[in-house]
Amino acid sequence: MATVLAGVMAVSMLATGCGGSKDIKDGKFTPSKSIQWMCTSSAGGGSDIFTRKIGDIMTAENLVNGQTIVVTNKTDGAGEVGRNEVATMKNNADYQLLTFNSGDLMPMVQNTKNRAANFRILAIMAVDKQLLFKGQGAKYDKF
């Protein structure tokens, strides 16, 4: 369980699609059409910005074979609508990514039958460090 918690506490990019794509010739996946990337957090939030930035880097570094990455935000049901869509996708599953963050864990585990086992972790894109800041006008320098 600790391994699962550590994995989901990091902002992770997950995908379904465990093979079977016609694009696989030598065991490596090479996209030949647009990639859909689902973000279950609100537009403009940290996960959304991070998802779009990583997508921009993947495009700039030609890691997606010149294909377009389309980010879609599905926040309904605390993100469960988007997570469930990706988890149960049959068609074009190789072209669907999902940003999963630590805020997605508890609603998923407490309220649904959907579990991390329904996804395949492709990359851990960041590990959050918790930082505490104070404003410049604060009376004290430290706690």
Regions found by a protein language model. Name each.
Residues 7, 20, 77-80, 111-112, ...:
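A generic structural micro-environment signature
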Residues 120-143:
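A conserved helix-loop-strand patch within extracytoplasmic ligand-binding domains
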Residues 9, 97-98, 122, 132:
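Well-ordered beta-strand positions enriched in small/hydrophobic/aromatic, beta-favoring residues
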Residues 17, 84, 108-113, 122-125, ...:
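Surface-exposed loop/turn and secondary-structure junction residues enriched for glycine/proline
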Residues 22-118:
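N-terminal (or domain-start) structured segment
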Residues 3, 7, 16, 107-108, ...:
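Generic detector of low-complexity/intrinsically disordered segments
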Residues 14, 91, 137:
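Residue-level marker of positions within ordered structural domains that often coincide
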